[in-house]
Structure formats: structure tokens, C-alpha cells
């Protein structure tokens, strides 16, 4: 739940001393407690739903990931998990009459974390109020040693398997969970010292890991929207290509 807020500082997250908070990318964040902004976002979503799209997917549906003390509103004693849950619940209520699916992206670590990572993303709280939940399970984004994997980016099958297994296990315990539809890696993480080039073999390894757990839906992300090298050869597995410029 972010937006450049320099022109509207009253609705932005601030430091405890009153200064405008900006994340590491220099982006100011809207206050997630701000119901006026909820209506703004959901109004746009409703307009899109009326235009004929069949799904509304919410990205950055969270608080900023920072360890700095922040000032958000007089309501900030309410749990962050509760705020994100209520927003998505309201989104579902307003969008379902238009016949669209409602989905949300979450950090890849969320299904393997008991809490909310201090950003308001808790697996069961989100999965219970939407149609699809998409953990961003890019192997390059996991720290060395995740699930005892020395270099996650160099082990796409194992990384996706252990990450998705947490999601499947938790959803199986729920009465009515959202369908799990992860984001998987369609790019090469050249910034990592220990990385491999991602092509069709690495893509298929991720898909196979999901399939072994019964997860047959997924989205592929490439930050430059370059999917040609991944799709040169025909595959027996259908591939959903997302034109998402950022996750």
C-alpha cells in the first residue's frame, strides 16, 4: 500500500519525529490505516472491474519493511495484520459483485513464517478473504541457508519445493483458503555472486517443484518483461506470462 506522498504528507507514514518516511528507493508510503485512501484504491479497482477485466491483483499490500519506529495514526495500536486483512476483505466485498477474481501478492517467506514479518502479511489472514494468493518465490530472493540450501538461486527445484510446501501445509489446515498461485523466477540474478543463468531448464525445475506438491498454477516474473528465451521451445506445461513490471 504505497504511493508517492510528498504532495499529500498528511496521509503518509512518518518518522516518530514527524519527518516524512521514505524507503530505500526514496518512495514515501501512504498510511495503510487511512480509510480515505482505501476508498481511492478500491474505486480504481471497481472501475477496472467494470471495464471487463476478470481479476484484480493487489501488489505491495503491506506495510514498509523497516526496523525504524514509525508514526502512522491514532489507530496504530491496531495490529498491522488486522489492517491488511480488513482492506482485502473490503476489496473482496466491493469487487465480487462485478464478477472478478480478487488476488494478492505476498513475500515469499510469508508461508514459512509464523508471524507477519512486521509488514502485516500473515498467511491465513490473507488467504481467507481472497480468491488467489501469490507468494513471490524467486529463488534469488532467499538468503543462503534457507531450508538448509547453500545457494537458493542455484537450486531452483529445492528452493521452490521447500517454500511452496509451507504454503500448501498451512492452506490444507484452512476451511476455505485461497488458491495458491506463486510467482516464480524468469530472470537471471546477475547481482548475486553465486547465481546461475535462468532459462527454460530452470523455469521447468520450478514448475516441477510446484507440481510435485499439487500446485498447478503459477505466474512468471521478469523485471524487464523479457520472456522470449523462456518460451522458445514448446512445453507440455502451460505457462502464464505476466506483464508485471515490478513485484
Annotated model-derived regions:
Residues 25-39, 74-82, 148-156, 193-194:
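The substrate-binding groove and active-site-proximal loops of carbohydrate-active enzymes
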